[in-house]
């Protein structure tokens, strides 16, 4: 009788813990996904889009070549982060991650292509503008699905 009771308690605990673990995994997946895309967006915005808007890639700009190479390295980092996010969305059951993840492979290819040009010191204005359009498409798609993604500047003490 005691063995049956222990088996019943164990089975009940597993039935309750199973869905709870899945819910935690989904929250953890979303947090990791947001981290990777956030890191990619930060690299793009800080080292590519902002200098582009400030004309730091134009001929004759001070440190033009260095800025272009930095942008290329930043896009390589962003492509790695997006690739990690794509891998996460392949096996997830979360509908939001699956939908947003379906938009990422094309974005990753664009990041890599423009990044390779910039790392070689070749300025690709159309590519940078295209990347910005793709970023806005991703942000709008997330908002349409009820998960708005807003860039937030987080102050780091001492910097």
Regions found by a protein language model. Name each.
Residues 9-18:
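Bacterial N-terminal signal peptides
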Residues 1-9:
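Bacterial N-terminal signal peptides that target proteins for export
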Residues 1, 18-19:
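Intrinsic low-complexity/disordered segments
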Residues 40-92, 103:
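Alpha-helical segments in soluble extracytoplasmic regions
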Residues 26-36, 56-70, 89-99, 120-130:
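Non-transmembrane, amphipathic alpha-helical segments
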Residues 19-25:
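Sec/Tat signal peptide C-region and signal peptidase I cleavage site
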Residues 30-53, 106-159:
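C-terminal amphipathic alpha-helix
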């Amino acid at each position: 009788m005691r063995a049956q009771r222990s088996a019943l308690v164990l089975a009940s605990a597993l039935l309750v813990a199973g869905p709870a673990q899945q819910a935690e995994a989904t929250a953890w997946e979303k947090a990791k996904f947001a981290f990777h895309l956030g890191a990619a967006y930060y690299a793009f915005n800080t080292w590519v889009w902002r200098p582009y808007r400030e004309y730091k890639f134009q001929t004759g700009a001070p440190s033009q070549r260095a800025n272009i190479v930095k942008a290329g390295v930043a896009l390589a980092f962003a492509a790695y982060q997006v690739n990690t996010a794509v891998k996460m969305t392949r096996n997830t059951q979360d509908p939001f991650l699956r939908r947003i993840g379906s938009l990422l492979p094309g974005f990753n290819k664009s990041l890599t292509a423009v990044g390779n040009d910039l790392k070689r010191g070749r300025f690709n204005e159309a590519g940078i503008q295209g990347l910005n359009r793709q970023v806005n498409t991703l942000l709008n798609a997330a908002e349409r699905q009820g998960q708005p993604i807003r860039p937030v500047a987080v102050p780091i003490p001492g910097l």
